[in-house]
Amino acid sequence: MEPQDLKTVLGAGLLSFPVTPFGPDGGFNEAVYREHVGWLASFEAAALFAAGGTGEFFSLAPDEIPAIVRAAKAAAGNTPIISGCGHGTEVAISIAKAAEKAGADGILLLPHYLIDAPQAGLYNHIKRVCDSIGIGVMVYNRDNSILQADTLKRLCDVCPNLVGFKDGSGELGLVRQISATMGDRLTYLGGMPTAELFAEAYLAAGFTTYSSAVFNFVPELAVRFYKALRAGRRAECETLLKDFFYPFMAIRNRSKGYAVAAIKAGVRLRGYDAGPVRSPLVDLTSEEMDMMASLMASVDR
C-alpha cells in the first residue's frame, strides 16, 4: 500500500491492535491469532496493528514480529495491517525492513527504549527509520519520545512516507499546536490508554480517529461509541462511558500493566485462547476475571 493511501485509510474509521496469543510453550500461537484477527476484521475497523503495544510489542523478540505480521495479513482480508516497530534506531530499522518484507502496509514507530533523547536525536531516529522503508510510517508521541511541533514539521518536510501522528502524551496544548501546524499533511490518531475516555477532547484537537483496545473483545460496542462520537451524539457517548468504559477503567487501574492484561483477559473471556501475558506483566486475579466477566455480560445483553 502506498503511504498516501495508508494515510487516507487511517483517517477513515476506527483502529485497533489485536492481542498476541501465546501457547503453552510461551511462543506465538498463530492459529488462535488468525482466528481472532479474522473475527475482528469482520467488524468496521479501518486498519489493525499487529504486534503493537497491546500486542505486547515490548516483550516480543524482533524475529517474532514478521510471523505475526504475515498471520495478520492472511487472516484480515482487505483490512490493512500496520506493524509495531521500535527500540533503538538500528533495531527499529531491522524490524521495519522485516515488517515491510512480511507484507505490512505500514509501521507504527513506538517510543525507543528507556532513555530520554533531545529533539535532534528523535529527528535523526525517526528520519533513519522512514528512510529505510517505502511503506507508510506513524510516529507514537508518548513517554520518553515527545516530539515538538517544529521537529515534526522538519520530519514531514523530508520524509514523504511519514503519514501519521499518534499521541499518547495527553498534552492537549502540544497536540493542538501540532495538528494546527501540520494541517492535513498527517492523519492524527488518539493513543491514550482506553482511548475512548479521551476521544471527545482529542476530536476537538483535530484527531478524527483513535486506536481502541476494547475492540479486541467488545468490537460492536467500540464501533458504536466511535460512530456516536463522530456523529456528535454526546448523550449516547456518555451512556457508554458510564455503563462500560469507566467500570473497565476501574479494573484496568487496579494494577500496573493491566492496560494490556485486562484486554487479554477480555479476549480469553470472549472464547479465544489468548494465553497469558508475558513477564514482566501479570494476569488478572480470579476476582478481577469475575469482574471482567460481569462487565462484559452487562453490555452483551
Curated annotation (Swiss-Prot):
Keywords: Lyase. Disulfide bonds: none annotated. CDD domains: KDGDH. It comes from the Bacteria. It catalyses: 5-dehydro-4-deoxy-D-glucarate + H(+) = 2,5-dioxopentanoate + CO2 + H2O. GO terms for molecular function: 4-hydroxy-tetrahydrodipicolinate synthase activity; 5-dehydro-4-deoxyglucarate dehydratase activity. It is an enzyme of class 4 (lyase). The keyword Lyase applies. Its EC number is 4.2.1.41. It holds the Pfam family DHDPS. InterPro entries: Aldolase_TIM, DapA-like, Dehydro-deoxyglucarate_dehyd. Pathway: Carbohydrate acid metabolism; D-glucarate degradation; 2,5-dioxopentanoate from D-glucarate: step 2/2. One of its GO terms (biological process) is D-glucarate catabolic process. SUPFAM superfamilies: Aldolase. PANTHER family: 5-DEHYDRO-4-DEOXYGLUCARATE DEHYDRATASE 2-RELATED, DIHYDRODIPICOLINATE SYNTHASE. Belongs to the DapA family. This is Probable 5-dehydro-4-deoxyglucarate dehydratase.
